[in-house]
């Protein structure tokens, strides 16, 4: 690293909120940056700075203290915004204003801002669209993880590169023994062990959860055991716990995974190797499984999920936005029955596509290395 006063790399995103997908993105960024940047020069803007300092040994400050950011920016050479879906206004345009404002400040202080491996949208408000467009114009480089985001930027005449989610590059770390033992207790001969990832969503009602239960009871072997995966506890457990109760009432076996010993997202990658199939709504549950060659059955609560499932040729349960539940069980039953007939084939397709996704994801880090080299 240079002795230039501008030596810091700032990383901003939805970090420190207990969302495993965002934490996996952060871990992948830190692990790549460590190859060329000293740990004390990497700073995470976090909702839980002490946690990130302890786990990764990097610097971290509260994302809510503007004074901390303003103190760091004069020393920052690179400002990474992402990845994930930061520029969206599903609840309010506040997120677009917050992250866009950071990019504007970074540019004003002479740092090199990059929108990194993001999925842009949905953007329904005029404020959200304006804030996102301005942030994109002020960013010196942009990589996006899906074609819809690229098309949006092209429509705005803003240059960007299509890459892939950085988590495709995240190598596994050792799984704590206690976590592996939890799953191994469910094993009995050739019994199928199925991971299940659900989350609260406007288009996943109690009725649709009941339909999913019915479909899995009909399509999975009678001795199949469920391992319920809370990737973000407050959003996931309200769906997972009643599902497990109903599953057990039907005479089936399963458990909610105790995740307290899982400190790093990369340990979840190792966890996937203990499963034979993953049924998931969450994007990163699907990515963790697919990158390890584990077949998946996905529920498309969001367009980004459908994009990955189609890319990897995995069976899809379409979640309509609203209404249309009359034929939903039959549609899901048809999709699951056809899709799950050959798990070995699905696993082979996963492995084949994961390699190309990893290569595409590496483009994000090649760009970072190039920027850092120029800035040195």
At which residue positions do the language-model features occur?
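Active-site anion-handling motifs in enzyme catalytic cores
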Residues: 1-376
């Amino acid at each position: 690293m240079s002795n230039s006063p501008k030596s810091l790399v700032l990383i901003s995103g939805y970090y420190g909120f207990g969302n495993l997908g965002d934490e996996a993105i952060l871990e992948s960024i830190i692990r790549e940056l460590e190859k060329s940047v000293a740990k004390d020069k990497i700073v995470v803007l976090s909702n839980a700075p002490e946690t990130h300092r302890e786990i990764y040994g990097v610097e971290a400050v509260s994302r809510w203290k503007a004074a901390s950011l303003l103190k760091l920016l004069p020393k920052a050479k690179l400002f990474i915004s992402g990845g994930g879906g930061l520029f969206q206004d599903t609840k309010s345009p506040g997120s677009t204003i917050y992250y866009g404002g950071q990019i504007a400040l970074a540019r004003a202080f002479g740092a090199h801002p990059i929108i990194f491996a993001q999925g842009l949208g949905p953007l329904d408000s005029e404020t959200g669209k304006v804030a996102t467009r301005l942030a994109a114009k002020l960013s010196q480089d942009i990589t996006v993880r899906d074609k819809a985001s690229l098309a949006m930027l092209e429509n705005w005449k803003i240059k960007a590169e299509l890459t892939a989610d950085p988590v495709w590059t995240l190598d596994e770390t050792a799984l704590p023994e206690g976590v592996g033992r939890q799953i191994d207790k469910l094993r009995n001969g050739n019994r199928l062990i199925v991971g299940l990832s659900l989350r609260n969503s406007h288009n996943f009602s109690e009725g649709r959860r009941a339909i999913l239960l019915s479909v899995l009871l009909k399509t999975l072997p009678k001795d199949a055991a469920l391992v319920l995966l809370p990737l973000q506890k407050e959003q996931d457990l309200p769906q997972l716990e009643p599902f497990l109760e109903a599953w057990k009432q039907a005479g089936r076996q399963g458990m909610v995974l105790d995740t307290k010993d899982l400190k790093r997202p990369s340990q979840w990658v190792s966890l996937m190797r203990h499963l034979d199939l993953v049924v998931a709504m969450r994007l990163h549950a699907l990515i963790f499984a697919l990158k390890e060659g584990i077949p998946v059955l996905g529920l498309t609560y969001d367009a980004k999920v459908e994009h990955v499932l189609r890319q990897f040729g995995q069976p899809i349960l379409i979640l309509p936005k609203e209404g249309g539940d009359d034929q939903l069980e039959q549609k899901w039953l048809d999709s699951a029955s056809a899709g799950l007939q050959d798990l070995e084939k699905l696993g082979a397709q996963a492995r084949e596509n994961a390699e190309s996704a990893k290569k595409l994801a590496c483009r994000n880090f090649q760009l970072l290395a190039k920027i850092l080299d120029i800035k040195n």
